[in-house]
A protein has these predicted regions:
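Extracellular/periplasmic metallocenter environments
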Residues: 61-62, 100-141
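Active-site/binding-pocket entry motifs
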Residues: 34, 62, 73-75
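Short edge-strand/loop segments of extracellular domains
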Residues: 71-77, 139-141
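N-terminal edge beta-strand
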Residues: 23-51
Length: 141
């Protein structure tokens, strides 16, 4: 016969082991090689506020990629690209973290606590943002 204590322990273990109760998960795939189109895609573009884990996969065969996460001031905000460097000027942004230096075929993850608003995910390796490696994520209440 289960005691109240045993039931409480079992419930606590179940809750701790259930990923769905731990927040949202967004799967991100980065792909593209030099001279070809480059993409950053997500399996969902809207998540509720709270803890979010980004599972990032570099699907390229020869190119290294990264993923930077920033909160935009408004949904229509554009990021400033330093033309001479072919990179987004990260000094003007508040990064919430990044998955850096993903080798071809590699995986990485980023955990962040998100508040409602619009976010951008992008690769800031030289020329990759300009080649299309960016996507927006909407976080709801």
């Amino acid at each position: 016969m289960l005691t109240i204590r045993d039931t409480a322990i079992a419930l606590a273990l179940f809750v701790a082991a259930t990923p769905a109760l731990a927040g949202s998960m967004v799967k991100v795939v980065e792909s593209g090689e030099a001279g070809e189109p480059m993409t950053l895609t997500m399996d969902q573009t809207t998540v509720p506020a709270g803890d979010t884990t980004f599972m990032v996969h570099n699907d390229a065969t020869t190119e290294e990629h990264e993923m930077v996460l920033v909160k935009l001031k408004s949904p229509d905000q554009t990021l400033t690209v330093v033309k001479a460097k072919h990179r987004v000027d990260e000094k003007t942004l508040k990064s919430l973290g990044e998955v850096a230096d993903l080798k071809p075929g590699a995986d990485g993850q980023l955990k962040a606590k998100l508040v409602p608003g619009t976010y951008m995910l992008f690769c800031n390796i030289k020329g990759h943002y300009e080649a299309g490696m960016h996507a927006t994520l909407t976080v709801t209440k």
